[in-house]
Amino acid sequence: IDYLKIPIQTLKVGSLGIHNLLGLAKVKKARLLIASTSEVYGDPTVHPQTEDYWGNVNPVGPRGVYDEAKRFQEAMTMAYHTYHGLETRIARIFNTYGPRMRLNDGRVLPAFIGQALRGEDLTIFGDGSQTRSFCYVDDLVDGLFRLLMSDYAQPVNIGNPDEISIGEFAE
């Protein structure tokens, strides 16, 4: 997973990168769509997560730099919306799949596909009871377009509302 290899750069993109992007959008009077993530919820205690759930994030855990970078991006985006009147949209993207996925990106679906293509047994971490929702890329693009064209400025979850356990998925 890239953010594990480049944690400082990940945090800089989440802070300096979003600040520069929002500043440019302000100057150009552009509407800006931010691609956030379901990882802002961390290890959720609520399933499925709704947009008003604040999450359960460990800021110094193994995923902390990514989770916190995205949470900061959302906070900065809402600040620009509130204080500068910038037209912003925040999409919290859940597990997306489709053509041209990287099979080694650390997510369960591409990992399973890669293992199956190599004729290997599927690796399940934990007891398999962890749940995920999967969203096909075409549905994601449709959701992003609809959000961008809407007047809604609060974060929006884009994914499949139905979750499946990793164990069930592996079967």
Give residue ranges: language-model regions:
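N-terminal Rossmann-like NAD(P)+-binding domain of SDR-like oxidoreductases, especially those catalyzing
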Residues: 1-96, 116, 126, 138, ...
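Flexible, nucleotide-binding loop/lid elements of kinase catalytic cores
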Residues: 47, 122, 154-156
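Residue-level signature of the cytosolic catalytic core of signaling kinases
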Residues: 61, 101-105, 162
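Heptad-repeat alpha-helical coiled-coil signaling segments
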Residues: 101, 130-132
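Activation segment of eukaryotic-like protein kinases
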Residues: 111-117
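A conserved structural motif in NAD(P)-dependent oxidoreductases
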Residues: 123, 133-139
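Mid/C-terminal beta-alpha module of Rossmann-like enzyme folds, strongest
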Residues: 149-171
